[in-house]
Amino acid sequence: MKGATVTQTVNVVQTAADGLIVAPTVFNGVSGEGARIEVKVTTNGTVNVAINDSWMTNVSSRAAMTEQAMAFNVAVNYGTPRTGSITFTLGDLTETVTVHQLAANIPDIGMESNAVELAAKMYAGWNIGNTLEATGGETAWGNPKITEEYIKKIKQLGFNAIRIPCAWDQYIENPATHEIKESWLDRVNEVVGYCVANDMYTIVNIHWDGGWLENNCTPDKQEENNEKQHALWTQIANRLNHYDERLLFAGTNEPNVDNATEMAVLKSYLQTFIDAGRATGGKNAVRNLIVQGPNTDIERTNNLFGEMPTDVVPNRLMAEVHYYTPWS
């Protein structure tokens, strides 16, 4: 600015409409045992934070600051190494932080026990019902989500085996191939990890699941259901293959069978389950598997079941019945 005899310079600093910087943008080798990570966020506005994976949570305060360290908890990972992301948004600006987490170390006790030996090790079992098999989602029937603290409490009460009934049909994202949503496979794996990491024998099944199998042990549905049974068990077995002998697979739940014709169809479903699991190799090549009697009723099983299905591995099959007979 100029006056008659005075000259003065004024510095003008223009602030960007939106500014957003995050650092670091990548976390490598995050402990599988769980960890807390911090992201430095520099901004001139209110940032929206979206965590794109359920195993991370934002534990930061919401103080209005131009620069702050935002903290996130990364849950324990009992599966395989995984990658997630956190997205920061301010106006039209987006920054993404990628998190690579290792797998936690669960001591591996091997796969040496056959069916008789393994059954003898399970002395008290707990069925976690109305959760992972619930129609509409894990909490749809009124129970909270399964946590590791819950599993630890069951163990403290003296139980050493857990049955996890599971729904799968409602989580299929491609009906043509029966492809299961990766997020659901991850969730089941997470719960199995809670159990095995706490030294609990664990049974995973295909439960009622809308009745597509257990209400249709009939010749007209046999081919269609065997295709679906094979596709589902291939995916389940592959996803959980890394667990040792403390994990068992159960092919069905309570298949409704009234006669020899329907029993033959059920046998084919059970054979498909066994063959699909064994074909995935790895630990599943020798994993102990559980097959279900008709209606899981002991009298009907004694009358209709006959010989056990064929298995390429000797002495690795168990038969399942439920305590419904006698009744009044």
Report the location of each language-model feature.
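A short beta-strand micro-motif common to beta-rich folds, especially ectodomain repeats
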Residues: M1-K2, T80-D92
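An active-site-proximal structural segment forming one wall of the substrate-binding cleft
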Residues: G142-N160, T177-W208, W212-G251, V265-G281
